[in-house]
Regions:
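Phosphate-binding site recognition
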Residues: 1-434, 449-450
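A short beta-strand motif that forms part of the nucleic acid-binding face
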Residues: 43, 204, 471, 481-484, ...
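Active-site metal-binding core of divalent-cation-utilizing nuclease and nuclease-like domains
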Residues: 133-137, 448-472
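Structural motif
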Residues: 142, 474-476, 510
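Mg2+/Mn2+-dependent nuclease catalytic core
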Residues: 165-178, 482-499
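Metal-dependent nuclease catalytic cores in nucleic-acid-processing enzymes
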Residues: 183-190, 343-351, 440-448, 492-512
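Conserved catalytic cores of phosphodiester-cleaving nucleases, focusing on short active-site segments
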Residues: 442, 465-482, 496
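Domain-level recognition of nuclease-like catalytic cores that cleave nucleotide substrates
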Residues: 501, 505-533
Length: 533
């Protein structure tokens, strides 16, 4: 089987024998039930392939669709004038790059359809091209814009400056927003010349929207009819890749059901509508099946720089961000607010819908899967704590240590990690800041160990346990103190009976008291005790 990893050209996939998951019934429905759409999906989720498929369809390339659902659905294969604008691969942090990109695009189209001498701005010139294309072919124009938001995301919160035509200094971010708003405004005036428009991207901007200049597109990002338009459903995975899953199961020496469970925990969990259809991350699952290994493929391709910049302003506890219900207005429309980056985190694919409350039309948001949870928390921890070295190797060592039940080594690993955090990050003068740093630091560190079941501040009959980590062979029950003693922490675990619920559990139970010094910013006291309950 040939896996289309990194291939976004529909024609190449079909001509060269790569596997293609048939989405053309959804494409047919999309085309015949509206004409101006917007779709938001995370990076590497198949948006560019969708654009390429639509381009081939509207160009009437029927031979590429042989054997697919749309071959039977479409009775007329017409060749529409297609205008494909792709913002991928461009660096828009350079002043003038956006104008240059749009200028080149419009000039190329004018070579085909002619230039209207009365049109001066890029928007007016593009509108004239659309009109000429309609008149020349007798068919409405098709406009496909891939990653429409990249010119904004590249410069968002960078503080980069440029100069306007009058020599006034201004933010490059504002300049790009103005250019795009003017360019897209042509769609409203050119409505009669348009057959179909689709804009894809990661983020839907609000208030400062580039969409305000033209007919509001139909946002299908949370439309359950098109939830499977990008990504791989569980049904598609099991029907198309059954043999590959069996091969992975053999390699890992587990049953087929166990292998499906591991793939699901690692790469599944995306939901884009109230229907809660399970969608697998296509980039990760295809890489995993191809290489027959479970690894963090999507996260390794890099974290979006715009998100890293926004998180530098983020002052919320991640524990309070996840596992909560939100109205759609809180996470769908991004308002360029660095103090409330929830929409950016959600739309970038680091949070997803886990439940829908029909009565309040609100959504429970949480991490989609283990790959994303581990990667995102590690990214936030590195940004917040700024340790001297990347936490990745440290996390692997901690996971292996906890699998072995080595509490002494675990103490050394945790202590050394805290010691690696620069003093400037650890030093807190205000008591409230000391407490927040203490709590949030332990939360981030524990959350990075996502291979296991981690329970933070779990309520029990006798009180609230700071942290419980469950591994296949061991259960670790932690109580943390700040400027106290490990003995005091251990005593609390025993007196409150935090281990009581594991009375019938065959695993070894470890009770761990840990004291954190706000003076040094590190662990200065640790006591552990194995317990048979």
């Amino acid at each position: 089987m040939k896996y289309p990893i990194g291939i976004q050209d529909f024609g190449k996939i079909r001509n060269d024998g790569y596997v293609y998951l048939d989405k053309t019934d959804l494409i047919y429905d999309l085309v015949h039930n509206g004409n101006i759409y917007f779709l938001s999906r995370p990076r590497r989720f198949g948006k560019s392939l969708l654009i390429s498929t639509l381009e081939c369809y509207f160009q009437g390339k029927k031979e590429l669709f042989k054997g697919l659902a749309i071959e039977q659905l479409e009775k007329e294969w017409k060749q529409y004038p297609v205008f494909h604008i792709d913002f991928n691969g461009k660096n828009f942090t350079q002043a003038g790059e956006l104008e240059k990109t749009l200028q080149t695009f419009v000039e190329t189209q004018e070579l085909i359809y002619g230039r209207n001498p009365l049109a001066n701005t890029l928007g007016d010139r593009f509108m004239a091209v659309l009109k000429a294309a309609h008149e020349k072919t007798g068919l409405g124009a098709v406009v496909l814009i891939d990653e429409y938001d990249k010119p904004l995301l590249d410069v968002l919160d960078t503080g980069l400056k440029t100069f306007d035509s009058e020599g006034n200094e201004r933010l490059l971010e504002d300049r790009h927003r103005e250019i795009m708003k003017g360019f897209y405004s042509v769609f409203k005036a050119a409505d009669r010349d348009l057959k179909f428009v689709l804009l894809t991207g990661v983020t839907k901007f609000s208030q400062v929207s580039v969409f305000s200049g033209f007919n509001q597109p139909d946002d299908i990002s949370m439309d359950d009819r098109y939830e499977a338009l990008c990504g791989i459903t569980e049904e598609e995975l099991y029907s198309v890749f059954d043999e590959q899953i069996k091969a992975m199961a053999a390699r890992y020496k587990v049953s087929e059901d166990e292998m499906k469970y591991r793939l699901k925990r690692k790469y599944d969990g995306y939901h884009f509508s109230p229907s809660m259809l399970d969608i697998y991350n296509p980039f990760s699952i295809l890489n995993s099946l191809s290489k027959k290994i479970l690894s963090d493929f999507w996260f390794r391709t890099g974290s979006p720089t715009y998100l890293v910049r926004l998180l530098a302003h983020f002052d919320e506890n991640l524990n309070e961000l996840t596992g909560k219900f939100y109205p759609t207005s809180s996470f769908i429309d991004y308002k360029a607010d660095t103090e409330a980056p929830l929409p950016m985190i959600y739309q970038s694919g680091y949070l997803t819908i886990k439940e829908w409350n029909m009565d309040t039309d609100s959504y429970l948001l949480d991490f989609p899967n283990d790959e994303v949870k581990a990667g995102f928390v590690t990214m936030v921890a590195a940004n917040y704590l700024k340790p001297k070295e990347s936490p990745d190797a440290w996390v692997v060592e901690v996971v292996n240590t906890m699998k072995m039940g080595d509490c002494d080594k675990l103490e050394k690993l945790l202590t050394s990690f805290f010691a690696s955090i620069p003093y400037s990050q650890r030093r807190k003068d205000d008591e409230r800041e000391k407490e927040r740093y203490f709590q949030y630091t332990f939360y981030l560190v524990i959350r990075m160990i996502s291979s296991f079941t981690v329970l933070i501040e779990k309520e029990q009959s006798e009180g609230r346990v700071d942290c419980i980590i469950e591994t296949p062979m061991f259960v670790y029950i932690f109580e943390f103190k700040r400027d106290g003693s490990a003995t005091e922490a251990l005593k609390q675990i025993e007196e409150k009976g935090y281990a009581r619920e594991y009375a019938t559990d065959n695993r070894t139970i470890y009770l761990i008291g840990c004291n954190f010094s706000s003076k040094t910013g590190t662990i200065d006291d640790w006591k552990s005790k194995g317990k048979s309950v």
